[in-house]
């Protein structure tokens, strides 16, 4: 992968941390795409959650949850872009920034898995797990950033 990135980068050597950051951005964008493609499934899931208790709230909840997931996804992508920019400029605070986004992103992803209402998850399990995947790239990125010192 690094050799391909080097060729695309005009022959300049690309660090492994930069590759991990780029992979994290791609994974984040795929997570956003999953939310967009699964809007109907998310709304159907929430109809099941609210069916016995508040069927009138199911449609509204679907829109709220989808909007929330999209906003979180876009903010995550912005975090990846900011981290890539800081790394490319070789700023002193790149590692702190990467750690901050890793912790915040992972906490949000775990929260998405844990949020329940009426005993059921608000975010479908498969989508909650998919939201954790960019954190794996983030863990790789912060590890590689510390090795670059």
Feature map (PLM): residue ranges:
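Topology signature of small-to-medium multi-pass alpha-helical membrane proteins
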Residues: 2-149
């Amino acid at each position: 992968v690094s050799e391909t990135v080097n060729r695309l980068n005009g022959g300049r050597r690309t660090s492994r941390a930069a590759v991990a950051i780029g992979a994290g951005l791609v994974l984040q964008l795929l997570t956003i795409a999953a939310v967009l493609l699964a809007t109907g499934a998310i709304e159907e899931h929430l109809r099941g959650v609210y069916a016995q208790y508040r069927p009138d709230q199911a449609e509204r909840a679907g829109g709220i949850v989808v909007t929330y997931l999209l906003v979180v996804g876009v903010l995550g992508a912005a975090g990846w872009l900011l981290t890539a920019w800081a790394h490319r400029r070789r700023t002193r605070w790149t590692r702190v920034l990467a750690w901050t986004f890793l912790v915040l992103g992972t906490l949000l992803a775990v929260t998405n898995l844990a949020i329940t209402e009426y005993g059921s998850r608000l975010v479908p399990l498969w989508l909650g797990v998919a939201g954790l995947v960019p954190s794996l790239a983030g863990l790789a990125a912060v590890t590689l950033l510390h090795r670059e010192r």
